[in-house]
């Protein structure tokens, strides 16, 4: 049987200020809400039976805090990978969708017209994030043949990883749901085949 690397891909827990108003946090180091911290403790029980060999996490607190909780429970030390952080959105950081549509209507329109390549002033494009995240994932996969690893990252980052796994275009970014503290499972086989076992679980 072809050896595989299994990645358990997690989105961080609920953040402070989460609610019905959608907001771009990006590189802003937003903390976890009380519910978000509880979500990690619930998740660690779900993962208890998985033979996790390594744990990699974004450097932002909403991921790194949870990685410490999960790592302590699973017996692995989190490795911080700054390249796994969320897409930087420059001058949009911290603003709600409604605020952006009001304050930057032209930028909002331009991004919707080309979601893959448009770069907010001071920020990154989806393609930029793909170019910094996927080499890290490829390295993790190669390093852990025959093992299972845990990756704690962000909604946008996870969507890019999942789209890459199924060979879908980056323009389909928002066709994949990623709720707080959700679990995705991807098997990477040495022959190049990839199987997505779970999405947003």
Q: What is the predicted role of each segment?
A:
Residues 5, 13-76:
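Active-site-proximal alpha-helix that buttresses catalytic centers in soluble enzyme cores
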Residues 69, 160-164:
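Active-site signature of alpha/beta-hydrolase-fold catalytic machinery across serine-
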Residues 72-132, 187, 195:
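Phosphate-handling substructures
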Residues 15, 157-158:
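Short active-site segment of divalent metal-dependent hydrolases/proteases
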Residues 1-6, 76-79, 87-99, 142-147, ...:
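Acidic, low-complexity terminal tails and accessory targeting/binding regions
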Residues 49-53, 141-149:
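Surface-exposed helix-capping loop/turn segments at secondary-structure junctions
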Residues 154:
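Short basic (Lys/Arg) and small-residue
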């Amino acid at each position: 049987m072809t050896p595989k690397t299994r990645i358990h891909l997690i989105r961080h827990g609920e953040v402070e200020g989460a609610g019905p108003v959608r907001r771009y946090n990006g590189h802003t180091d937003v903390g976890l809400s009380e519910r978000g911290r509880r979500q990690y403790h619930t998740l660690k029980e779900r993962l208890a039976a998985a033979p996790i060999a390594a744990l990699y996490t974004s450097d932002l607190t909403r991921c790194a805090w949870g990685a410490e909780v999960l790592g302590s429970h699973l017996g692995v030390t989190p490795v911080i990978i700054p390249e796994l952080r969320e897409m930087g959105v420059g001058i949009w950081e911290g603003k709600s969708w409604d605020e952006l549509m009001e304050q930057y209507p032209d930028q909002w329109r331009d991004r919707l017209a080309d979601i893959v390549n448009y770069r907010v002033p001071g920020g990154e494009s989806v393609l930029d994030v793909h170019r910094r995240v996927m080499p890290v994932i490829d390295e993790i996969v190669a390093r852990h043949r025959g093992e299972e690893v845990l990756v704690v990252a962000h909604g946008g980052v996870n969507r890019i990883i999942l789209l890459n796994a199924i060979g879908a275009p980056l323009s389909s970014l928002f066709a994949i749901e990623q709720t707080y503290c959700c679990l995705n499972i991807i098997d990477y086989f040495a022959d190049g085949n990839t199987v997505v076992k779970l999405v947003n679980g």
